[in-house]
Amino acid sequence: MINTQNKKFNKYFVPCLGGIFGGIATSTHFWLLFMPLSLFILWSRSDKKLANFLWGFFFILVSHSWLYELHPLTWLGFSWISSLIISISILFGCSIIGGILVYLWGLLVKKILQKKEISNMNSLRLTIKVLLLSFAWGIGEFILSQTPLFWIGLGEGIVPGDLYLAGLARWIGASGLCVVQLTIGFWIYLIYEKWKRKYHFKKTFLFGLLILVILHFLGGLTNPIERNNDYPVALWQTNMPTREKTNFKNQFINDKLISAQKIALSNDAKLLITPEGTLNNNFNLNFKSKIRMLAGGFRNSKNGLRSSLLGYQIGDKTYSSFIDKHRLVPLGEKIPGFLNIFSRGLSAVGGIQPGSDSRFFKWKFTQPLAIAICYEITDGFKIRNAVKSGAELIISAANLDPYPRKLHYQFLSLARVRSIENKKDNIIISNTGPSGLISEEGKIIKLFDPNTEQNDVVNPNFSIEKTFYTTYGERPLFLLCLFLIGLNLYFGKFTN
């Protein structure tokens, strides 16, 4: 009876616990404690189909639990019960997709790695197989990041838990960080397996520890850019509840903007930035702008409504420059065509249209910029392309209301990894937070208090330096993966 209970515990509860640990670790200081343990559990059950699904399901369920905060949607015309069903369905739907993806990865593990032989397998062959499986996960996250179905995974979730290891992103990007983390998880699992079978594991432990030290040293090896105060930028964290924003009149926004511009000028700012969606559609200033401004808002184009960052010169009453949001939130901002007859989406403004996929923004009042509007912070590839094209600073504008602090922390993690990857300062500005400045090393220089209206100045550095990752992107990762596939085929064919 007890033995049966233990089997059920190992079969069902342990993989669930592993996924929960991973979800808790994502974008928190608990990473050091929970993520290695979570990945150890993943590897230990990786040949079990159900275990893989459960790990992935609970990882997403916990890490993306903020999706429940969509409820209540009564302000959009949904009934209370409909709102609850929609929110829970979205969360569980995403969790099921996560479970399926890890399940598919597990099939690859079963095909490539015979777990019963790992304690006796040649070290080189074992390393090749584990690296190949880890690369498969990392490349999978990269591919997903090019779709609107991805928010955060293992790669960016390492921050703030281990900033030294995250420093490797300058060379290998977020996808490479996935590879490193999964390899660490397997190393712990291999030590456990050797200990359980009473094999010598001292060399495995010491060699792995040495590699860990080297990786942390390389990740922490950087040449900080000397900070300056040459271009002070004012950030207006508006703290306007999204569920009430439809009631705000243009005159109210104008009055707020006049006040924000006066504060910015009193602090000697050269530029004022406001969060995503600050200005209503067809908004015009009823005064001449006193300062250069990048304001989140909406604009009508011939193809429909766009969410944009709108550029104002001194003296402008309407925007003279813009960059449109390209990546739209599924259901929230863009719904499939066949659903248009049922809903305008889970958004106050209804469906909007995507702009150009380029995140490079050049105007004559600053050095070239890389712009990420909300969800676009997940797409490291396009931000990297903007930096490669000459952007000297990243600006990340968002509206994360009404979501909880958990989402704020994940947005911060994403923004910090983008800074590390490209060695660029990152100005973040959000409605209810987070807002502030992140250094090129991924360190937080200034962070406003959340859920309060604030107007303060940050002093970003513009930099023309480019990292290895900025220059080459994921190409080395794909080439190494192909090389590992070749080696795995070679050893499979010519060795026992």
Swiss-Prot record:
Species per Swiss-Prot/TrEMBL record: Prochlorococcus marinus subsp. pastoris (strain CCMP1986 / NIES-2087 / MED4)
Gene3D superfamilies reported in the protein's UniProt record: Carbon-nitrogen hydrolase
InterPro entries (alphabetical): Apolipo_AcylTrfase, C-N_Hydrolase, C-N_Hydrolase_sf
Chain's role: Catalyzes the phospholipid dependent N-acylation of the N-terminal cysteine of apolipoprotein, the last step in lipoprotein maturation.
Gene Ontology terms, MF aspect: N-acyltransferase activity
Protein name in UniProt: Apolipoprotein N-acyltransferase
Cellular localisation: Cell inner membrane
HAMAP family: Lnt (MF_01148)
GO cellular component: a single term: plasma membrane
GO biological process, one term: lipoprotein biosynthetic process
PROSITE patterns per record: CN_HYDROLASE (PS50263)
PANTHER family: APOLIPOPROTEIN N-ACYLTRANSFERASE
